[in-house]
């Protein structure tokens, strides 16, 4: 169904995709589709690396939190060394792979304040990276892990600088709204299907109207939740504040209310009401103030590039 709609790039997350027994059979059945999977990397041994090479249409994005101490503290002792060994196996076989990092108040400097971490990933053979800001969803959320507006402002300058200067593509899903025209979720360019089959606007927006086991993909993408989402996009003229969870929380409240969407797990509604919601309201207000001058500067640069383009063509 996805291919019938023109979708030829599919991302797998978890849990851990590499424990799924029929994983490589899916890759073999769809050689015309490009797959990327978020993985902890610990199961990528020589046999699995050979299977990836044979398939030719899968790129792993390996999750880590920084260097050894930070990664092992969150993911278990010895994980970092297993990841480094997995990267060597992938690199030696010429398999395209990248990394995935969750940026928190505690590890933001370790990841991006200097070139050390990115340079190490380049040396290991990674060519791309996804930067996810910590979002307070799921069980036992810790608001003190969320990056501050000041840290986020630093990332708004630092991530594009890395792209310009390094042979490494780094994307920041929250600060790169300038380049994507705002939020890409809600079926505009992307949507998420969870393990139960609930079709959500985004991997972080845990609300749904339909389940993929009950309706076709085409039907689901035209449901009230996706229509309500898309008619509001972009959620702000400030493209550095594109997210309806942490940047425009009133938008998500309106979408859920209007569409009648249900939470896809207990506790998902905490981003809409209660202490977490109040925290996000304050955080979004502070980020609007901090990001406004950066957004203005980016818009000015964009206009200059457009003028140059028009003169050439």
Protein language model features and the residues they cover:
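Structured loop/turn residues at secondary-structure junctions
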Residues: 15, 40-41, 188, 204
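Short clusters of hydrophobic/aromatic residues that line enzyme substrate/ligand-binding pockets
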Residues: 71-74, 147, 183, 209-212, ...
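Radical SAM/AdoMet-radical enzyme domain recognition
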Residues: 2-13, 20-132
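Flexible mid-to-C-terminal extensions adjoining Fe-S/redox cofactors in radical SAM and related proteins
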Residues: 204-313
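Short, conserved loop/turn and helix-capping segments at secondary-structure boundaries
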Residues: 77-80, 146-149, 153, 210-215
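A C-terminal junction/extension of Radical SAM enzymes
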Residues: 108, 132-201, 242-251
């Amino acid at each position: 169904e996805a291919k019938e709609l023109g979708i030829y790039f599919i991302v797998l997350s978890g849990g851990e995709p590499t424990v799924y027994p029929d994983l490589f059979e899916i890759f073999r059945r769809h050689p015309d589709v490009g797959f990327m999977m978020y993985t902890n990397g610990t199961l990528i041994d020589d046999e699995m690396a050979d299977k990836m090479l044979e398939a030719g249409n899968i790129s792993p994005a390996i999750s880590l939190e920084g260097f050894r101490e930070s990664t092992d503290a969150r993911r278990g002792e010895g994980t970092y060394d297993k990841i480094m060994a997995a990267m060597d196996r992938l690199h030696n076989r010429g398999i395209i792979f990248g990394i995935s990092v969750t940026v928190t108040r505690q590890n933001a400097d370790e990841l991006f304040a200097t070139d050390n971490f990115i340079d190490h990933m380049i040396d290991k053979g990674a060519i791309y990276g996804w930067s996810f800001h910590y979002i307070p969803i799921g069980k036992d959320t810790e608001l003190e892990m969320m990056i501050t507006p000041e840290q986020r402002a630093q990332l708004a300058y630092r991530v594009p600088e890395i792209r310009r200067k390094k042979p490494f593509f780094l994307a920041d899903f929250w600060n790169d709204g300038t380049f994507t025209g705002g939020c890409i979720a809600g079926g505009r360019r992307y949507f998420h299907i969870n393990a139960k089959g609930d079709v959500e606007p985004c991997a972080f927006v845990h609300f749904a109207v339909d389940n993929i086991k009950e309706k076709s993909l085409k039907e689901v993408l035209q449901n009230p939740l996706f229509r309500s989402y898309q008619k509001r996009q972009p959620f702000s003229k400030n493209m550095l504040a594109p997210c309806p969870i942490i940047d425009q929380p009133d938008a998500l409240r309106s979408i859920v209310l209007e569409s009648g969407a249900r939470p896809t797990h207990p506790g998902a509604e905490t981003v809409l009401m209660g202490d977490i919601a109040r925290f996000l309201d304050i955080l979004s207000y502070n980020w609007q103030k901090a990001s406004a001058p950066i957004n203005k500067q980016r818009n000015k640069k964009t206009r200059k590039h457009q003028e140059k383009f028009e003169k050439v063509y």
